Amino acid sequence: MFDYVKRMIASIVGRNNHEVNKEPRIIKASEHGIDPKMVSFAAVRTCSILQQRGYKAYVVGGAVRDLLLGVKPKVFDVATDATPEQVKRAQRRAFIIGRRFRLVHVVFGNEIVECSTFRALDASGVRKDASGRVISDNIFGEMWEDAARRDFTINALYY
């Protein structure tokens, strides 16, 4: 199964990992085999509410990896083009956390969905203190930029 996931990722990102593709590759449900019943109600509801308000919202990262492997994820993260303030207004129980990386925790019972805004590649707007320490880098961007700046290819998968 792991080899299947590796082959799928290689087909998505191609062989040249240095090239950034601005257009997402959409894989049909019949091809990726993710069982939607394995996605938590809280993650589905978080995405649905944002999408109903006109925002893009996707389950992202390790949860997508686990879903591809047929394993029920323990944690669900959502990436969106809504700002933290917009997410907070849209969701009933949502709390903005963090200073440097502003995220929103959306609470459903005992489950927390971590919701982040797509981040930009361009760091020219990053504010630093006198010692060069980054004070704030909440520079929002497009989905392709968010995918390109993630630390591992697997974290750049959106569902």
Predicted regions and their residues:
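Catalytic cores of the polymerase beta-like nucleotidyltransferase superfamily
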Residues: 1-159
